[in-house]
């Protein structure tokens, strides 16, 4: 199974590819990086993930780039890790919340649903770029 994550300072959005369908999963709320990396490691183990797709911004965001790489090194995972450009994935995900009112959009942003929809976009890009080549 393939899992994607959108690593943020407060939440980690999660999406999975199941039988060819991309599904958002419950986001990991991040209290500190050790707890978050442990939670992600546990999820990867429980779901028997073979490939972890990680969203990363372009090189001009050096601090974020380094922070994401450092976080992923804390994750206990022996499978394949693939980094995919995440630029605008959160903007695209936010557009998917158009049907929600202002208050519900705010709630979706805070509870991690937006982050997991962003992880869906990252997983879509992986499927388009990597799986289509095979």
Swiss-Prot record:
Cell location: Cytoplasm
Provenance organism: Helicobacter pylori (strain J99 / ATCC 700824) (Campylobacter pylori J99)
Name of the protein in question: Putative pre-16S rRNA nuclease
GO molecular function per UniProt: nuclease activity
Group of enzyme by EC: hydrolase
Alphabetized UniProt keyword annotations: Cytoplasm, Hydrolase, Nuclease, Ribosome biogenesis
Source species, domain of life: Bacteria
EC number: 3.1.-.-
Keyword Hydrolase: yes
